[in-house]
Amino acid sequence: MNNNEPDTLPDPAIGYIFQNDIVALKQAFSLPDIDYADISQREQLAAALKRWPLLAEFAQQK
């Protein structure tokens, strides 16, 4: 599983928070860790880097 994704779900009392469906399924069905890549997140990142060239420069320096 991607290291930057939380292993626990947020507290629903806090209000609307983005919920990772893979984490929810993993907890609901006691699934083992899987190597999952969020394709839509990658596409959004690529679009942001294309839209903002300065952001792309910072990403290359890292």
From Swiss-Prot:
Q: List the disulfide bonds.
A: none
For this UniProt record, the keywords arranged alphabetically read as follows: Cellulose biosynthesis
- Misc remark: Cellulose production is abolished in E.coli K12 / MG1655 and W3110 due to a premature stop codon in bcsQ.
Give the gene name: yhjR
Q: Where are the coiled-coil regions?
A: none
Protein known as: Protein YhjR
One GO BP annotation of this record: bacterial cellulose biosynthetic process
Q: Please give the knockout or disruption phenotype noted for this protein.
A: Not required for cellulose synthesis in strain 1094. When disrupted in a cellulose-synthesizing strain (W3110 derivative with a functional bcsQ gene), cellulose is no longer made.
Induction per the UniProt record: Part of the yhjR-bcsQABZC operon, it is expressed about 5-fold higher than bcsQ (when the latter has a restored reading frame). Expressed in mid-log phase, expression increases dramatically as cells enter stationary phase, the increase is dependent on rpoS.
Q: Which organism's genome codes for this protein?
A: Escherichia coli (strain K12)
InterPro entries on file:
CBP_BcsR
The cross-references to Pfam families, in alphabetical order and at most eight, read:
CBP_BcsR
Q: Which domain of life is it from?
A: Bacteria
